[in-house]
Amino acid sequence: MFGGGSPDTGASEDLSGVQFVNGTRSGNTALVELAKTQAGNVGGYPYWSWYGFNSRVEWCACFVSWCYGQAGLSEPRFAACQSQGVAWFTSHGQWGARGYENIAPGDAIFFDWDLDGSADHVGLVIGTDGSRVYTVEGNSGDACKIKSYALDYACIKGYGLMNWN
């Protein structure tokens, strides 16, 4: 039911020297800066607890929802990637499939690790340099980590497109 973690258990990436490309959609840099400060958190306690769980769950979606909540948003709020997260963005006309070129900082990025058509993991977009997308993800090896992926990476299911206007 819940979103699983990233199979990559490596350390967070160093973003120094990365030049991000600005798209036409505005993002939320304050949300991104908040999410980046969470890198290194292990176990996800503040996120799944904030969501209302009494014990540890797969917490990637709780992390994303917590970040949106800290930005003052009451929704989207989801603990399951496919049945709640993807469903919310799709039903609100705010979904962009893999290859969508106008992602913005603060958008959600959904992954399908086993390529079965169902999202298994979610993170937040920090930005893109035109060839890679940079993310902050909860529950990546049971920790918050900064990661990057080629924009055409097959395991990217799509993006939850936030409307910050």
Where are these regions (language model features)?
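N-terminal capping segments
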Residues: 4-73
